[in-house]
């Protein structure tokens, strides 16, 4: 009996090793060698307040604003106004009290099927295209792809990612700024502050089903085991990056959908960019685009492929800054 058990154990280990090798080969063969940084001709422009086309700037240009806010939006015509009102009210008040403070809000319509762009353009007309810009993508790329398009078209010294649902209280950007400041001195002007909901975990568990709680813990384990160490909440959509950190990390980003946050932080840790995790005020907002089981399954696959593709060299990091 003992011999049989040892044989079965050996067979199990061999099958697991063979499966890992097979998955690694598939991950390597199917990998895109370079991040898909393509732009449709229509995506190289934004519409100003008069409805005229203007060319978008580049992340590699020198910054002309203190803060850029990138808002990825997919079918957000109903939730976007609440977020935009809160954000712009805060930013306008801050500018009124500090005349040196400058900002821009970039709404990236990720191929929406509703009136998201039209809703966003109303804010452009109200505040002017120097403060509010709308980029309309020709097709849906995914949240990561939309954020990257906004980041690459930003003008800020610091770049804030903020979800269109307004789940995080916008004034908490000051907490992220404090988190960045506490990381100084920044190596090569690079640092990241991540908004975190980890302090709300016990409360959220009490409101979730056992199945969703199991999925959440499983995802957290895979993130820790495969990709990112030391960050309890990788998925909060409220993140602040220095311009150099944004340029370096997003230049190497491959994942365009929900797991892009994990790859972003994985890249940052590989580049030894300091990261602060900062507790923020967050509220569950109805209308999430995340389908619990299938989205978590997709993210689990993405996590495995992130690790294997970097490990096998199918994906590599961009180490140098693009010349201006």
Curated annotation (Swiss-Prot):
GO terms for cellular component: cytoplasmic side of rough endoplasmic reticulum membrane. Its EC number is 2.4.1.117. It is an enzyme of class 2 (transferase). CDD domains: DPG_synthase (cd04188). It is found in: Endoplasmic reticulum membrane. Its main location: endoplasmic reticulum. SUPFAM superfamilies: Nucleotide-diphospho-sugar transferases. Keywords: Endoplasmic reticulum, Glycosyltransferase, Membrane, Signal-anchor, Transferase, Transmembrane, Transmembrane helix. GO terms for biological process: determination of left/right symmetry; dolichol-linked oligosaccharide biosynthetic process; protein N-linked glycosylation. The chain crosses the membrane at residues 8-28. Pathway: Protein modification; protein glycosylation. Residues 29-324 are cytoplasmic. Residues 1-7 are lumenal. One of its GO terms (molecular function) is dolichyl-phosphate beta-glucosyltransferase activity. InterPro entries: DPG_synthase, Glyco_trans_2-like, Nucleotide-diphossugar_trans. It catalyses: a di-trans,poly-cis-dolichyl phosphate + UDP-alpha-D-glucose = a di-trans,poly-cis-dolichyl beta-D-glucosyl phosphate + UDP. It is a single-pass membrane protein. Dolichyl-phosphate beta-glucosyltransferase that operates in the biosynthetic pathway of dolichol-linked oligosaccharides, the glycan precursors employed in protein asparagine (N)-glycosylation. The assembly of dolichol-linked oligosaccharides begins on the cytosolic side of the endoplasmic reticulum membrane and finishes in its lumen. The sequential addition of sugars to dolichol pyrophosphate produces dolichol-linked oligosaccharides containing fourteen sugars, including two GlcNAcs, nine mannoses and three glucoses. Belongs to the glycosyltransferase 2 family. PANTHER family: DOLICHYL-PHOSPHATE BETA-GLUCOSYLTRANSFERASE, GLYCOSYL TRANSFERASE. This is Dolichyl-phosphate beta-glucosyltransferase. It comes from Mus musculus (Mouse).
